[in-house]
Design a protein with these regions (language model features):
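A cross-family phosphate/adenosyl-ligand binding-site feature
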Residues: 1-120, 126-168
């Protein structure tokens, strides 16, 4: 976590059972002196609430590419410029696929495509999803684009299975 000390970190939280771990990540980043802004995907809000995230980050939670708060501001550009680094934890197979194919349909994927900052991805998914040929191809693409992967780990999963796919 030393890389993330005393920096502006944009944390993107995708939808998956591991999303609850992002709350601890926010706490650790803040403890290390970093400022943390967050983006929640639509499905992430099924696992963690904007209130929990904003309470820990002490910042507004971003979740919509078309924000009614300030129509003149382009959140995907301003957030990308603000961040020293971007951490996506957890990142799902769906978001990996979106970014690898250049799909920019929501705020999270748009920020990732618009950024020239270092981007770290912490995958979390079922072992069969992690091992699927499409996922493997997309991971190779993203690594070639310069994205850094953190994990996943091998272990027991929420679905009751064991294997590689746990968020590190």
């Amino acid at each position: 976590m030393n890389y993330f000390n005393n920096k502006n970190i944009l944390l993107i939280i995708c939808g998956g059972i591991s999303a609850y771990k992002s709350l601890e990540i926010i706490r650790l980043l803040k403890k290390s002196g970093s400022q943390v802004k967050t983006i929640l995907t639509k499905s992430a809000k099924e696992f963690v609430t904007p209130l929990s995230v904003s309470s820990l980050s002490q910042e507004k939670v971003y979740d919509d590419i078309f924000s009614a708060d300030n129509e003149a501001e382009m959140d995907h550009i301003s957030l990308s410029r603000w961040a020293d680094a971007i951490l996506v934890a957890p990142i799902t197979a769906n978001t990996i696929s979106k970014v690898a194919s250049g799909n920019a349909e929501d705020l999270a994927s748009t920020v990732l495509l618009a950024s020239n900052k270092q981007i770290f991805l912490a995958p979390a998914m079922n072992v069969r999803m992690w091992e699927h040929p499409s996922t493997k191809e997309n991971i190779i693409k993203l690594k070639n684009f310069g994205y850094k992967f953190i994990g996943p780990e091998i272990g027991d999963m929420a679905c009751g299975e064991y294997g590689e796919g746990k968020m590190s």
